[in-house]
Amino acid sequence: VDKGSYLPRPTPPRPIYNRN
């Protein structure tokens, strides 16, 4: 779920939402 990558998920703070 890339659309939910910017959401507070139980994952490390990586710039997933910052990728073009």
UniProtKB/Swiss-Prot annotation:
Main location: secreted
Entry PTM: O-linked glycan consists of a Gal-GalNAc disaccharide, O-glycosylation is essential for full biological activity.
Keywords in alphabetical order: Antibiotic, Antimicrobial, Glycoprotein, Immunity, Innate immunity, Secreted
Residues the record marks as carrying a glycan: T11
Annotated stretches, region: Disordered: 1-20
GO biological process: defense response to bacterium; innate immune response
Localization terms from the record: Secreted
GO cellular component, one term: extracellular region
Keyword presence, Protein transport: no
Biased composition annotated in UniProt, kind: Pro residues: 9-20
Role of this protein: Antibacterial peptide. Affects Gram-negative bacteria E.coli 1106, P.aeruginosa, E.coli D22 and E.cloacae and Gram-positive bacteria M.luteus and B.subtilis.
Family classification: Belongs to the drosocin family.
Protein known as: Pyrrhocoricin
Organism ancestry: Eukaryota, Metazoa, Ecdysozoa, Arthropoda, Hexapoda
